[in-house]
Amino acid sequence: MFDTITGIVKNTRDSSSVDALIEALGDILDGSPQGGEISDADAKRIQTEIDKFDQIEYEPNTMRKALQMMILKVSKADQLQANYQLTPDTIGDVVSYIASGLLENRQSLSILDPAMGTGNLLTTVINGLTNNINVEAHPYGLENDDAMFEIAASSFELQQVQADLYHEDAITDVMVPKVDLIVSDLPIGYYPIDENVANFETKAEKGHSFVHHLFLEMAANHLADGGVGIFLVPSAIFKSDEAKSLLKWMQGKVYLQGLLNLPKDLFANEAAQKSILILQKVGGDAKQAEPVMLGEFPSFKDAKGVQNFLTEIDEWRKNNMSK
């Protein structure tokens, strides 16, 4: 259905695939084709697809996965840049599993993704929290890219998830309340507007600053005392020349509770490898875990090995982390 309507719009408008998808999602949510310059025959075809959609009640996760496949298709067709890449479900499921364990005694919580992209990681974690610990989660999302924000907003609406979404740069001042949980597949690279980061402790002494360092600082500022942040970061985050300022900033503000390398076979090369970074905001009942959880996931193809590793994480959490 997504594919059919997107194809009709793309051919009619001679637009990019991602723009066609955005218009198609708008048509589905509006219940009829809204754009002009569509022939009666094409409008009828679109309406037929929308009517089929309206007659079926989809599970939110089914809807998310269908949209995920469509995003992958249009990203490939348009050869979109790396920041359009979706966080794989296997990683999203691991993040939600860890979050569920750390917050298992909560009945409700607030969750933020300050770099939500198309919203796939955030909705994956929300679904996981609901299924794993039956918690009521209220999501907040920030995204600066126009196209990704439009897709994310449509995705949440199609999944019938009530969320507060903001189309803005997370590094500038944002009107998001402090939350209990932050999850994010952080952008990697340099932040281009130096004057926006003048008050950041993690800014570079000279030149542009690492954007993932800035996002960690921003995230900590939006965590409630004792709140948890789970981030996808470069595995070498603490080995760069700029790591000294990051570690200095962390002292007294957040506890480094875990750093778990994702399987090497997920990435093109060692330099591209990512890890799951677990931070906890100082305050409340939070305390430094002893020891910090360090390790590397086995290949996700090794189901038994992954389950054993998750069991190790559970044991570490029960013995070392406050809830």
Which residues does each PLM region occupy?
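A short N-terminal interaction module
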Residues: 1-76
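Class I SAM-dependent methyltransferase Rossmann-like catalytic core
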Residues: 77-90
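Phosphate/oxyanion-binding active-site loops and adjacent basic polyanion-contact surfaces
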Residues: 87-92, 208-212
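Conserved S-adenosyl-L-methionine
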Residues: 88-184, 189, 235
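Mobile active-site "lid"/loop adjacent to the S-adenosyl-L-methionine
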Residues: 185-215, 236
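Conserved Class I SAM-dependent methyltransferase catalytic core
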Residues: 208-265
